[in-house]
């Protein structure tokens, strides 16, 4: 487990307009499985089967070693990890130009600031590390000829698989909460024909709601009232371009100012 002293005091999660509305109305976090992510390397570990190696190397000459390719079981491992590990992601950066553009839909969404102490009560917060393009992906020998998800060693490896990403993702400065999909903290919600994994957000865990630069005043008021139902001490902010540098800044906004701006814009 990540050393708690090294975890920043605040963690952030970016949302699109529909995503933040749903999150605040239901007061829930969405959990993902590796197979649902947009990164093809998600949990795509190079695991090799000891029994398969023994079987294939018998009688092989060095020039025939090309036939050992079948010992790696990447896709099978990726699917298997989805059975033992679900995760939800956070960032340590609330002023990322890229994440505000992408995850917050060009500043029309919002970013939630979470209290790390409330988040860490799950006891499974881990830091993501990033590999350089030329780095070899780690190889993991399986303890058995088949994938046994109940093995403690395998579950430990599954968490390692989920916390290593390519260097292109470095800008996310990511931490992940990782839990088994069948954890008592996680529930299921039907959306259309599919089921998604969710968990309740502890009361008071949301310490600030940061509005995107392009969020209308009326929407700010609506989101502010939603979040205060379960997080009455939540503060508010608005992200904006710095006047002199190529960076974003977060300006604090009192709730009274949000409501006053709304009444002025409606007159």
Give the positions of each predicted feature.
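Partner-binding and oligomerization surfaces adjacent to conserved cores of proteins
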Residues: 1-267
């Amino acid at each position: 487990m990540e050393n708690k002293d090294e975890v920043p005091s605040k963690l952030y999660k970016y949302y699109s307009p529909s995503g933040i509305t749903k999150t605040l109305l239901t007061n829930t976090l969405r959990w993902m499985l590796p197979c649902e992510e947009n990164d093809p390397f998600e949990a795509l570990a190079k695991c090799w089967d000891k029994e398969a190696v023994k079987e294939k190397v018998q009688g092989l000459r060095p020039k025939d070693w090309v036939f050992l390719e079948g010992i790696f079981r990447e896709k099978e491992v990726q699917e298997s990890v989805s059975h033992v590990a679900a995760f939800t992601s956070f960032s340590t950066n609330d002023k990322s130009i890229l994440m505000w553009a992408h995850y917050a839909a060009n500043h029309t969404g919002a970013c939630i600031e979470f209290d790390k102490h409330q988040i860490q009560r799950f006891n499974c917060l881990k830091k993501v590390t990033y590999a350089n393009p030329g780095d070899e992906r780690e190889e993991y020998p399986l303890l058995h000829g088949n994938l046994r998800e109940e093995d403690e060693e395998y579950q430990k490896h599954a968490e390692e698989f989920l916390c290593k990403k390519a260097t292109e993702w470095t800008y996310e400065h990511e931490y992940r909460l990782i839990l088994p999909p069948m954890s008592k903290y996680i529930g299921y919600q039907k959306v259309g024909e599919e089921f998604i994994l969710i968990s309740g957000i502890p009361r008071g865990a949301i310490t600030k709601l940061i509005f995107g630069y392009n969020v209308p005043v009326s929407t700010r008021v609506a989101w502010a009232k939603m979040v205060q139902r379960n997080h009455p001490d939540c503060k508010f902010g608005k992200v904006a371009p710095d006047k002199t540098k190529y960076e974003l800044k977060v300006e604090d906004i009192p709730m009274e100012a949000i409501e006053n701006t709304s009444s002025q814009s409606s007159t």
